[in-house]
Amino acid sequence: MLSSLLAMAMVMQADTTRAARETFTRCLNQFVESSVSARKTQEQFTAEYPQACAAEQTAFREAVIRRDMAMRSTRAGAEQSASLEVEDARVNYSERFEMAITPR
């Protein structure tokens, strides 16, 4: 029992997705900031945003899949988890853009 708790604690301490997540979200943030600075319209942003940070997204997605597979998740479950995490990040930064361009 104690060894199981120690193993779980070690897994929780080692966030294998942290670097990839930070790189991906930093890229999204930079894209949003540059889009706001360039005074892009919502339509321009919406057209360009899905292609932004593609390499960083792929690296993050693969890191999430590796993490989940290491925790004995199924491949399908790991892919679904990765898709949800990517979608959450993209929605978050898309909403930041919308808030930044909305007149107060």
Report residues per predicted region.
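Classic N-terminal secretory signal peptides
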Residues: 1-15
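Generic N-terminal initiation segments characterized by hydrophobic and/or small/turn-forming residues
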Residues: 2-5, 25, 42, 81, ...
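Signal peptide-directed secreted proteins
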Residues: 4, 40, 66-69
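Short N-proximal segments of mature Sec-exported proteins
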Residues: 17-63
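Compact alpha-helical subdomains of small soluble proteins
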Residues: 46-104
